[in-house]
Each structure stands twice: as structure tokens, then as C-alpha cells.
Design a protein with these regions (language model features):
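Exported/periplasmic ABC-transporter solute-binding proteins
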Residues: 1-22, 28-30, 35, 39-43, ...
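Short active-site segment of divalent metal-dependent hydrolases/proteases
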Residues: 51
């Protein structure tokens, strides 16, 4: 099980992992909000590996006694994603410009506060002296859902992870507006082995390896932990 913000990464590296481990025939992924996945694992859903987009959600699983090992392998920061079809394109320059007071009628989405991407957004809004109520017109259960709505033009903009915005912008699916370091926030990415299997350990070792981390940082815009 893995945070939805890792979907593009795992799709990209899956063949490389299998080539390096020919005895493993395949990997099955289940993506969603880290908080939702953590609750499922604690409640007994079967999984061999958990990749979380926050320390808090990983601790939920760890404190329930479900983890055999936990490693921090990357971190991410927030970014404003703008729909390429938005009439507000060019007028969205900072957090304040996401409000109706600056851009009347603008439609903005955030992840729900219980999801790591929503918690990250809350910290950014607080740092910018703003609030969720002043910005959000709708809430998404995961960053994947929020990104899709922005790309399709259902929303003008939203606060997502830098890695997701970079991936979309490189493909002409969105535009990115950087959030200043003084206002921005970070979230850590953690991997946990949940079952005592040699194959599971090989997969965890791969995520902690230099090749995977280099791909994360160079190709997808994640940061070193």
C-alpha cells in the first residue's frame, strides 16, 4: 500500500525493480490517502509494505504493532497547481491570490485535513496568515483526486505536492507556482516492512537504495530526507 503521490514513481520504476530481481514476478500496488491506508492496515487489511507521505500516519501503523522496520527515504514540499485552462492563469502568484478577495469566483481545492497533503496545506496556510475556510471551495480525499480535478479544469487551482505538480507541468497538464520557503512546509516519506518475507525486505532495500532515491530526486522532484 502506498500514498497516491507515489503512484507515478512506482509505475516508472517497476520494470527496473523486476529486472534487478528476476525471481519476483510482479508487484501489486494499492494507492490512496496515507491516513486511509493506515487505518485499513490497522484494521487488518493485508499488505506487505506501507509507504506513507507523513510520519504521523506511519506512526499510526507503527503504534499498532504492525511494522517490522520503518525508514525515512524522502521528503516533499507544497506547491500551487494551476489548471492550464483557468481564466485565473497568470493571476495566481501566491497563497493570497487563491482567495475570492483577490480573485473573485476562483475555485480552489485542498486535500482533506486528515490526509498528509491536507495537513501540509494547513501548515502552509497558517504560515501565510490564511485559513482553509478562506481558500477551499472543495476538499479531496487524496492528492491524486485533487490533481485530477485541477488538470480537468474542475478547479482553478489547489495546493499539492511539488513532485505531483512538476510531473503534471512537464506534460502540459498544469502550471506550477512555487511557494516561498518562509511559507512552505515539508512532509517526510516513510517505508515500512509489514511482513517478515525476504521478498519484502528486497523491496524495502530497493526503496532505500541510491538508484531509487536518485530517480525520486532528479526525475520526480522529491527531496533528500
Amino acid at each position: 500500500m502506498a500514498a497516491s503521490s507515489m503512484a507515478n514513481v512506482f509505475t516508472d520504476v517497476q520494470n527496473h525493480f523486476l529486472e534487478e530481481h528476476p525471481c519476483i514476478t510482479g508487484v501489486t500496488y494499492s494507492y490512496g490517502s496515507s491516513a486511509t491506508l493506515a487505518a485499513q492496515i490497522v484494521n487488518g487489511s493485508p499488505a506487505d509494505v506501507f509507504v506513507s507521505a507523513s510520519e504521523a500516519t506511519m506512526n499510526t501503523v507503527k503504534n499498532a504493532g504492525r511494522t517490522l522496520s520503518v525508514d525515512n527515504f524522502a521528503k516533499n514540499v507544497g506547491e500551487i497547481m494551476v489548471s492550464p485552462n483557468s481564466k485565473y492563469d497568470g493571476r495566481i502568484t501566491d497563497i493570497t491570490s487563491l482567495t475570492d478577495a483577490v480573485n473573485p469566483g476562483i475555485k480552489v481545492g485542498l486535500c482533506v485535513a486528515t490526509a498528509p497533503c491536507g495537513s501540509l496545506a494547513n501548515t502552509i496556510l497558517k504560515n501565510a496568515n490564511s485559513t482553509r475556510g478562506a481558500v477551499a471551495d472543495t476538499e479531496s480525499p487524496s492528492v491524486e483526486d485533487l490533481v485530477t480535478k485541477i488538470q480537468m479544469g474542475e478547479l482553478d487551482a489547489g495546493i499539492v505536492y511539488h513532485s505531483d505538480c512538476q510531473y503534471a507541468e512537464q506534460r502540459g497538464l498544469a502550471k506550477c507556482v512555487a511557494i516561498p520557503d518562509a511559507v512552505n512546509a515539508t512532509t517526510g516519506y516513510y517505508v515500512a516492512a509489514l511482513t517478515p518475507s525476504p521478498i519484502v525486505q528486497q523491496y524495502v532495500n530497493y526503496i532505500n537504495g541510491s538508484d531509487f532515491k536518485n530517480t525520486l530526486q532528479v526525475k520526480f522532484g522529491f527531496l533528500a530526507p
